[in-house]
């Protein structure tokens, strides 16, 4: 830790306080996340340190770079590259009655999918994607923060400040208590974020797990074994759920064109194996008019 100096507190993340800091000798500005774990007395589990150290290998222009993992008196500090703005703050800053430029929506979504595909290929899930952990710079680049931390530290029900962790972007298989889930959970979250990029409003903003599920069901219909094999045997599925018919996604997301709505619907398919993958989504016609050669990952993809 002696290599870094804290400049100021910039926020409170899922796992602890986040500081803006600087590397003393290089002057590099960084984000310093102090990880606060439930079992504070026992110190940091070695499994968590091992898991998180592997994340230093995730090097991609659309993934926030983990630069260092440091221990100080049984506290774990994660040192990340610094970006000053997150997507939530940016969406909140757009004046009332105005919306994000449709080409910027497209560019951001494509870059998010690039970052997710890169991590999924390396068997790393995010599990807690939301606008707050999508960071942006002033050149049109968006990067995913906190990839892999859920596996290292778990996804807490509450932030250490006791603020409830948002359920708005959580996939239905997670909400229904599925013991096994995989990469489609991140695609679902990305779909809900896609809708929010277009409308500035969360697509499904529940205030409890059951309210979250019912908001999804009211729009997409209550799932059953016909549309999602074995959903009725998931731990938190109840046969007493109201049986809503599928509503209209297009009436909730008015700012998307036909291709955009088609891609969104494919990202929000109930049955996880049938949900579009990040890689498949990147080849969807919605992106046909996006100049991918200008995107930060173009050099590594040979575009």
From Swiss-Prot:
Protein function: Plays a key role in the control of the eukaryotic cell cycle by modulating the centrosome cycle as well as mitotic onset; promotes G2-M transition via association with multiple interphase cyclins. During G2 and early mitosis, CDC25A/B/C-mediated dephosphorylation activates CDK1/cyclin complexes which phosphorylate several substrates that trigger at least centrosome separation, Golgi dynamics, nuclear envelope breakdown and chromosome condensation.
Catalytic reaction annotation: L-seryl-[protein] + ATP = O-phospho-L-seryl-[protein] + ADP + H(+); L-threonyl-[protein] + ATP = O-phospho-L-threonyl-[protein] + ADP + H(+); [DNA-directed RNA polymerase] + ATP = phospho-[DNA-directed RNA polymerase] + ADP + H(+)
Statement: the UniProt record of this protein carries the keyword Transcription regulation: no
Protein name stated in the entry: Cyclin-dependent kinase 1
GO MF annotation, one: protein serine kinase activity
GO CC terms, sorted: centrosome; cytoplasm; nucleus
Regulation acting on activity, per entry: Phosphorylation at Thr-14 or Tyr-15 inactivates the enzyme, while phosphorylation at Thr-161 activates it.
GO terms for biological process, alphabetical: amacrine cell differentiation; cell division; G2/M transition of mitotic cell cycle; mitotic G2 DNA damage checkpoint signaling; regulation of mitotic cell cycle, embryonic; retinal cone cell differentiation; retinal rod cell differentiation
Protein species of origin: Oryzias latipes (Japanese rice fish)
